[in-house]
Amino acid sequence: MGFMFLAESFDEWAKPKVKNGYNRFFATDAEKDVVNLVHATRNHPSIVMWSSGNEVPDQWGAEGVKRAKWLQEIFHREDPTRPVTVGMDQVKATMESGFGAIMDIPGLNYRLPLYDEAFKKFP
């Protein structure tokens, strides 16, 4: 039996979900944490892709797009062989901001009625 794994890094970036969350460390530690994750797991045969976040509040607006690009570039620099995704629960917002379009593989969580529209916007 084989398993395929998506190695996920963060539950929040710069915008907080909770008062004492990772957002307090994002600016100083995110790059180091991505590098450590990739270096620790990149040679495992079950890792098929990377995720730079799950339902992060940064999905809204231009700053979130910049952060998504920055994180994806770090993953690509450290491992150019695997794609990067983000689990996006704000599908409409990611279509409008361009957030989803920059992902190697857009990760759509929920919002099933928007999938056809998202498929057209996220080639």
What are the language-model segments listed below?
Residues 1-116, 123:
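Active-site mouth of glycoside hydrolases
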